[in-house]
Amino acid sequence: MNRKVIVVIPAAGLGTRMSPVVRGESPRGGKKPRASKQFTDLAGTPILIRTLRIFAGVPEVGEIYVSLRKDEIAGFRARLEKEGKEILKKKVELVEGGEHRQQSVANALAAVSADKDDIVLVHDAVRPFVTPEIINEVIDAAGKHGAAIAGVPAIDTVKQVERTAEGALISSTIPRERVVMAQTPQGFRYEVIRKIFDEAAADGFMGTDEASLAERSGYKVSVVMGSPRNIKITTPADLQLAEFYLKSA
């Protein structure tokens, strides 16, 4: 099938949990501290650029849209031209993000021109260890089912709790075989992602991820196997683990 694959990377967050260890050059230029976790250096390269390189290396991917804070767009474009020439072999658009992830994705979708059966992947800016194999499996599952995510089985026992005046009390144990830990990319046929975002906006609904919007709109979301290494780098401990992964690769 001759379908286009579009990648959306929401990267407008501040990442306050990472701020104690943020290092590297600001996308706005200079060395002043900032808390944008996606620009944190990982072995000398910003996490966001590492993530973009993975998607740029997947032949099926045709276009990449990155949502950024308005004051970071010009600086990041300059960094891409300097450090990401292989990324720019794809069509790359930098768009202004929103206050929340969902708005950042919506802003990127507003800039996209696609047919109903094209595939849109949404991926966390700070998951630089995603593999081409995972990406392609999500593409295929999204094309078949309309909506798909990468996920990994839960390892720890999961408890459901009730909040009471006495504190959090366990109400039940959720069987682990019924639980997956959601990752990205999360993929959708274009007609599906447009519909779920339009419905969420009309109702003022804010979801925790794109799959939650699809669930709310009545879609069954397929799950493909992700990887324990496909971590989201949001804390100093995550950054240390990422550095270990690079050294052990």
Which residues make up each language-model segment?
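N-terminal glycine-rich phosphate-binding loop and ensuing alpha1 helix
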Residues: 2-74
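Short, conserved active-site loop motifs that form the nucleotide-linked donor/cofactor pocket
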Residues: 5, 91-93, 179
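Short, high-confidence coil segments that cap the C-terminus of an alpha-helix
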Residues: 61, 117, 144-147, 219, ...
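Substrate/cofactor-recognition hotspot
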Residues: 124
